[in-house]
Amino acid sequence: MRVYADGSALVRYLPAPDHSVDWQRWAEQHGPELLVTSLSLIELRHALTTTPAHVRARVHALVDRLEVVRYSDQAVAAAATIDAGLSPFASIHLGVAVAHPDVTAFASYDGRLADAAATHGLEIVSPGLADGWWHAGTRAAARPPALS
């Protein structure tokens, strides 16, 4: 199983967001399975701008071990055809995950994006949240501010 992680998952490497401890424990065990893009890393780096230097250094050391994948033509084509009410950046996240032949799961804490990923047949990984949290009705309570 390879897991694509969006920015809403990666910011859980910071101490403040909800479920950060759950994410960090899960990621410690599954780090080699994670794939990210430059977009995921940009979202994380944006969140790091107000954190202390020692936290930034720790997070950079963790994410430097992640595999960064490029945007393939197939990923861009998939992103362009996704019709789930997603932002263009969220569509790119999903397009990369859907087009990558080894990705079977999607790590996210963004309800709309998790819902779209599940609709496209990906297992949702959101340590600390209940299975199916992204479904309509529970989405508003569980969804953190969107990064995408």
Predicted regions and their residues:
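His/Asp/Glu-enriched, well-ordered alpha-helical/loop segment
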Residues: 44
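Acidic, PIN/NYN-like endoribonuclease modules and their adjacent C-terminal/linker elements
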Residues: 37, 41, 98-148
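Short beta-strand scaffold positions
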Residues: 5, 35-36, 70, 88-91, ...
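Alpha-helix capping/helix-boundary segments
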Residues: 9-10, 40, 75, 93, ...
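Short, well-structured N-terminal submotif of metal-dependent ribonuclease cores
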Residues: 1-36, 48-60, 122, 132-136, ...
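Short active-site oxyanion
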Residues: 1, 30-34, 64-67, 101-105
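Acidic catalytic patch
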Residues: 64-87, 92-96, 116
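A general structural signal for well-ordered alpha-helical segments in protein cores
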Residues: 20, 41, 56-59, 76, ...
